[in-house]
Each structure stands twice: as C-alpha cells, then as structure tokens.
Amino acid sequence: MDPLHVLNKEERWVKVPIRIHKEPIVVKVQATGTTDNPTFLVELDEVDPAIHELIKREICRIFRWDISLHAIHEHFQKTNLKQIFEEHYGTPIVLDFHPYNSLVKCIIHQQLNLKFAFTLTQRFVTTYGIEKNGVWFYPLPETVAKLTVEELRALQFSTRKAEYIIDLSKEIQKGNLHIDSLYEKSDEEIMAELIRYRGIGQWTIQNVLLFGLGRNNLFPLADIGIQNAIKKLLQLEQKPTKEEMEAMLPEWHPYLSYASLYLWRSIE
C-alpha cells in the first residue's frame, strides 16, 4: 500500500488531497454502503461553497463513480477471467489524485522494486510537497522545476531520473505541456505527445492513461506482473508471448483496464 495514503480500512475512509485552482483541499471519503449498493459520505474542509461542485466532480473522477462495476463483472463472466473477477468482485479502479502525480510516480517507479519505489516517492513528496491536516500533497510542477539534480540525488534518485522529473516539470511550467488538456485527448494523441519527453516510454504512458486518466481499455502487454498472472491463471508452463496475449484481448474488450487490474490483484 502507498505509504502516502491516509486511510482507515476498518472505518472504511480515506483522506484525499486535491487541488482546486492550485489550492490544497483535504476531502474525507467514507464508504457507507455495500458492494452491490455502494454509498459514500464526503466531508470537506471549510471551503468556499462556490467550488463545491468542482470538488464533487474531482472526487467522482478519482473514484470513478460513473462506472458500473456490475456491468463489468457480468461482461467477464463469459471469459477466461471469470474466476478472478469472482474472487475480487467489486474491486474498482481508483485513480491517482492528479495526472501530474501519476507521471512523476511512474517515472520514479521505473525499474525499481515496489518497496523502494514507494520509499523514494514518499521522500520526494514529504521533502518538496506540502502537508495539510496530516495529508501530504505532491509538489506542484513549478516547485519541482526549480530543483537541482543534486537535490534529488541526495534523496537517492539516479541522475537520469532526477533530470527526467525536473525537465518534465520545466516543460509544464513553460506551457509546452498542458497536463489538464490530456483529459480531452485520445489515447493515441496522448501517446504521441508524451513519448517525446525523456524518461517517458510506453509503459509509463500506459500506466498514466490507466491510473492517471482513467481510460477503460488499456492493457500493458509488456508488464511482467500481468504476464505472470496469466501464466498462473491459465496454468501455463511459461509466460505467454505477446502474440498469445493479443489473441485474448478481443474477449476482454472494452474493459481491458479492468482485466489488467484483476490480473494484478490475482498475484498480490
């Protein structure tokens, strides 16, 4: 579990750090219903009532309350993923709290074991982000753009990763990359735009599309975890080839992102 998340599993709540017009706001979201009849209680900081609708929209986006998990579950009952969808019934895709956070986190996590990746991300956020009511907010791009490679190296970043994150943040600050405009673009347009930046490859973009922007039909074929999950589920002697996985995708379409999530869950 991400150590930056502030939550209570027993009481079923999580505190969500969001920014409206760059202002940090902590929103407490508590599950009060059931898997089949989900309801939620949302508690806000004292904020201007004029932005309540913006906050509501952002929380709905993060938790994907517009998506019917029942319809997705029914879709996979007719596929070879039926077993894992029954075992993990009702598991939603919950998004990273902002696409910029998602991009930075994915760059940090590249080629690291999960434990150290979380540690490094936590160091970065708690050193350069801000804390409010016990909840940490990622630093804004303009803050990161002012950092030096040496400052991130002191946190145990590699030189290249430090350069990638600082350079990306500078491009956002200059207005060359508009993060919020990604919501309106197709997967292909986003791939073509982000691939131009150093340190951002196909794996990173696919993860940002899935967990940063909430696209429903993403399946990272090169992901080792997914390959191992398919091998385990289908009792294969070796990991499936790219061609073998591609042959499975039409059956799972148009919910490939949920196939990805449930395959990951099956090997946790």
Task: List the predicted regions and their residue ranges.
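HhH-family (HhH-GPD) DNA N-glycosylase catalytic core used in base-excision repair
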Residues: 1-268
